[in-house]
Amino acid sequence: MEEYAREPCPWRIVDDCGGAFTMGVIGGGVFQAIKGFRNAPVGMRHRLRGSVNAVRIRAPQIGGSFAVWGGLFSTIDCGLVRLRGKEDPWNSITSGALTGAVLAARSVPLAMVGSAMMGGILLALIEGVGILLTRYTAQQFRNAPPFLEDPGQLPSKEGTPGPGYPSYQQYH
């Protein structure tokens, strides 16, 4: 499965870092807004102030964590594309596993293995859903079979013309 909308490999890393940062800031902002609202003292003004304060403090940190994950994932993915010479779902699955392992490298080895497995499984699920959606939607865009004419108007297989046409077999 080939993706045509992706940037070439050196720029893909920057593109994925920016996209991951944006996802982290938006998603983290929504989550932190709810969390800050719920944990603030009673009163609408206090709750709104707590919500904005939580977003201001935590959303950039969450976005940065997402950007690190996206950058490392894309770097490993581009390295595998270069090493293997082809771009397929196995690169993404392996990149997810290696990214999980590298980001958990400061922990105990068991946590590193667990993070690698979770990264690989998560990317395998994402790639599998992508392949299924591609196959499902590809059926919608197949060319329709050509319109068949009325078989009675087509010449017969023996070379005799259909009704209303003169026979030229005598001139052969």
UniProtKB/Swiss-Prot annotation:
GO MF annotations in UniProt: protein transmembrane transporter activity
Region feature (Disordered): 147-172
UniProt name for this protein: Mitochondrial import inner membrane translocase subunit Tim17-B
Subcellular location: Mitochondrion inner membrane
UniProt keyword list: Disulfide bond, Membrane, Mitochondrion, Mitochondrion inner membrane, Protein transport, Translocation, Transmembrane, Transmembrane helix, Transport
Described function: Essential component of the TIM23 complex, a complex that mediates the translocation of transit peptide-containing proteins across the mitochondrial inner membrane.
NCBIfam families for this protein: 3a0801so1tim17
Protein topology in the membrane: Multi-pass membrane protein
Organism: Bos taurus
Family: Belongs to the Tim17/Tim22/Tim23 family.
Predominant location: mitochondrion
Single GO biological process annotation from the record: protein import into mitochondrial matrix
Superkingdom: Eukaryota
Disulfide cross-links: 9-78
GO cellular component: TIM23 mitochondrial import inner membrane translocase complex
Residues that span the membrane, as ranges: 17-37, 61-77, 113-133
Subunit-structure text: Component of the TIM23 complex at least composed of TIMM23, TIMM17 (TIMM17A or TIMM17B) and TIMM50. The complex interacts with the TIMM44 component of the PAM complex and with DNAJC15.
Any one Pfam family match given in the protein's UniProt record, by short name: Tim17
PANTHER family listed in its UniProt record: MITOCHONDRIAL IMPORT INNER MEMBRANE TRANSLOCASE SUBUNIT TIM-17 (PTHR10485), MITOCHONDRIAL IMPORT INNER MEMBRANE TRANSLOCASE SUBUNIT TIM17-B (PTHR10485:SF2)
